[in-house]
Amino acid sequence: MATTAADGNLKPYLRKNGVKREHIGKNGYHNHKEKNGQGTDVASRCHKHEPFEQAPMYVAVLTYLGFGIVTLFGYLRDFLRAVGLEKCNIAQEREKQKDFVPLYQDFENFYTRNLYMRVRDNWNRPICSLPGPVFDLMERVSDDYNWTFRYCNRLIYDRHTVNSINSIMEEVSLRYMDSIHEELEQLVANFLGVESAMTYGMGFATNSMNIPALVGRGCLILSDELNHTSLILGARLSGATIRVFKHNNMQSLEKMLKEAVCSGQPRTHRPWKKILIVVEGIYSMEGSVVLLPEVIALKKKYKAYLYLDEAHSIGAVGQTGRGVTELFNVNPADVDVMMGTFTKSFGASGGYIAGKKELVDYLRTHSHSAVYATAMSPPATEQIIRAMKCIMGKDGSTEGLRRIRQLAENTKYFRSRLKEMGFIIYGNNDSPVVPVLLYMPAKVVAFAREMLARKIGVVVVGFPATPITEARARFCVSAAHTRDMLNQVLDCMNEVGDLLCLKFSRRKYSPQPDLCDETDFELDS
């Protein structure tokens, strides 16, 4: 295969990260036809099965038609309210407040009162038990089409949980920077294999308040189109120029990098002060995994910086739970800014920034999250320390490794069974985030209610949180789920899928054993 000029210096970096020469095609990218290409030898097996199957045409048409019908009925009901033929339960502005700026835009207000109110019983369900694979929902009923709810049960607090929290509070006290916070930061740095780390009390603010400290005017941010809202907000607050590349598309990213290097800033054409590439390890709504080796190769080639959000991947992927850097076997030092949260795998709250010591020292004095926010609470800090030590095996057991292995097995089993049934599934085979496409708004609501009737709690997401034709249910697989639990959910999924005609996939799925499964390692007895 002839080497093209567009390959440039990209191939040495790719080869260094484990990509072989025969995998490289035109413009330095893989020959394979998948939408997102194929990764390194270490993780190529999981990227070759990362499909984004499109909905059949009739499903897309019916989805648009469904939104059109409910919108038409919404305007009709607004008319009936205006003439007094239907009671209006929505809060009304006082006459003397008519000149005030409205809290909601016209469309948002219309959508809330006519569409969301009819189905809001499927969201914000009150949970009255501890987090776990099985939980209790408080029963509630509505006599006015979800404008108000009557709660039928009491919320019972767990006395043992309160006592354990009080004991931790007495043990570590409430000083701003206690030794427990320093212990956690050192533990995070060791876990990730970097020089230093810094923790924050809120995961969302870890992104939104730190990005403005890293870049500003005269800088360029290249952001994946499916990045989390916290990353988008942080980019906007920074004042930097923002350009969005197609999801996990290396051709789109390199095209923007080339243009940024060659053309510079608009009008003046001066070089950008910094170019920051912002990606996620596992994308929360798609379940896809970033093509990290290729992003690192492009970052090195064009002298850019890389910001990696591992909120959903840290503690979930990799042989020892160290995230996508371990999954792809890349050097953590190649990622300039490593961000993650403690709300998923560690069962707590807050987030962290990790990397070189100079970076962390700079953020301690320039980050709004560090200067103006309060420190992480001692109970949450202790919870994270114990969870991380369990994953690292520092508690003297192999329980952490067992859970990571169990999560990988559960993820692959759950995904493969759903594909066999005929559901359209997004994301990577190693991703515990499993989106099941439902498409039509009426079926989204019916799916959530039918699953709850079978005592299965699910999270459904629709427009405007997703594209109008890509409403979905999002399952997050846990290591605590047993095979019997998964089979129970799958049986209900199969039944409801047939009932509501949700099996849209036109692909025939034939499960094959993975001969290179990295999760098949022996645990110490």
Annotate each predicted stretch with a short phrase.
Residues 13-19, 23-31, 35-176:
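Conserved N-terminal helix/loop that builds the PLP phosphate-binding region
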Residues 225-233, 359, 469:
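Short, glycine/polar-rich helix-capping loops at beta-to-alpha or helix-loop-helix junctions
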Residues 243-308:
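Active-site phosphate-binding strand-loop segment of PLP-dependent enzymes
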Residues 320, 326-362:
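Active-site PLP attachment segment
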